[in-house]
Amino acid sequence: MSRVTFRSAPGPGAAPHVPPGLESAIDATATSAAVELFAAYRVTIAPVTGPELQLPIPDLSALGIVRFTAPGLIGTTVLGVSTGTLRRSNMRGTSDRDWVAELANQYIGRFKLKLLRMGFELWSMTPVTVSGRLLATAVSQPDFAPIAFRDAKGGSVAVWIEIDIDGPLKVTPPASDGEIPREGDVILF
């Protein structure tokens, strides 16, 4: 079962059509992008599923929100992080709000690059942040459970991805490995 939410765009129309394999690929990509992002900052997180997942996730201190688009879809990614996990990953000592925005930006970058390597291209917008306490009720919907993680010290990370399909999705043959930058590469243009 996918933890990424796919739905039809508001208005009349058919149910969302996602090409075979793309839904599970997006779900796996969403999970691996989070694990790899926090590993880059020496914080190990592991997925939480089934009865271990408690909603709402009680200790999220800040959320970074990023909108993204592609032909045929519009989506939102929300990255929520507990105070302890957020601060353990922040080696530069910036504010929690700035750091969760940076993590959300890096998360969507990793997510996009992984999908691009599979032939699916997304464009993202600048992240915004919100205090976790402001969204406690909005993110506790039982039918909108996050991709949830715990770190070794009990901290939490949660990722919600919602995708509205409003037309045919375009998946192209993947570019060659050398054409797509790796996570963390510096790109000058």
Q: For the regions a protein language model found, what residue spans apply to each?
A:
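N-terminal auxiliary interaction/assembly segments of multi-subunit proteins
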Residues: M1-F189
